[in-house]
Amino acid sequence: MKRPDGAALLELETTARQRGTGLNASVLLGRWRLRSVWPKGEIQASSFSGWALRGLQAELDLRSGEEEQLLLSNAVSIGPLELRFRGEASLRGRRPLLTFVFKTVELTVSGRCLLKREIPAPMPNRKPFFALIHRDPSGWLAARGRGGGLALWELAPAEN
């Protein structure tokens, strides 16, 4: 699978802003592994951040929820230790925005929960989001986060 560089992603982002992406929830479902990140305003991916997040096995997991909602989790792990945020997400607008709210955070070791806490809801106008840019049939997804950084994920192989 050929992944795009920063310049190609910026071109795709311009197109997404002008025309929308046509993406719907069904093409977003799955477990996505973070591959590259570009800091706000940069055309070069951050080598260190990408290396660190790949080393921490950073992932975004999207599943079908009730009605229009998606179930979302974001996790990092080192060996058997995992930190996972869980919540709900929904798509809004033509581009669209994937807005989400984390409800809980969990710390597990080898699948055993050591800590689980509820997370206070953010103010409505401060919800985190990903402005979706492109979902490629070859298995990658690009989006820009609320903080302005650009992220590229790769769809993980389906688990049996």
State where each predicted segment sits:
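Soluble ligand-binding/transfer domains with enclosed cavities or grooves
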Residues: 1-160
